[in-house]
């Protein structure tokens, strides 16, 4: 999947807040992802408890099938535990059944599905789309 563009301000805001992380292998950035500690814009009525949220996970096209996602999930699970969070959460387009199944094989359960309206906290490409909401324990 190719992500629509995010504004420089949004990306710089995540860097400044220390929420954007990179995965480096042999001095090359092979992946990036962001974390959040709440997500009411996407999770809405499902937003309860203190979870660690993973967002915008992306990997270099030249780096498929090398366990990058598993490494990110392991790191996030450890951070989730260290920070005393209730669990780890991810979301994706509800139509992305391949990624939903991938997460389920890694211990995530489908909590629900939510169609988002126009929300100034979210980029326009989120508006009107349905998202699958998944969570697991920190140490799954």
How would you label these PLM feature ranges?
Residues 1-13:
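Conserved GNAT-fold acetyl-CoA-binding loop/helix
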Residues 18-36:
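Conserved beta-hairpin
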Residues 32-64, 117-125:
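Conserved acyl-donor/pantetheine-binding loop and adjacent beta-alpha core of acyl/acetyltransferases
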Residues 59, 65-78, 101-105:
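Conserved acetyl-CoA-binding loop-helix of GNAT-fold acetyltransferases
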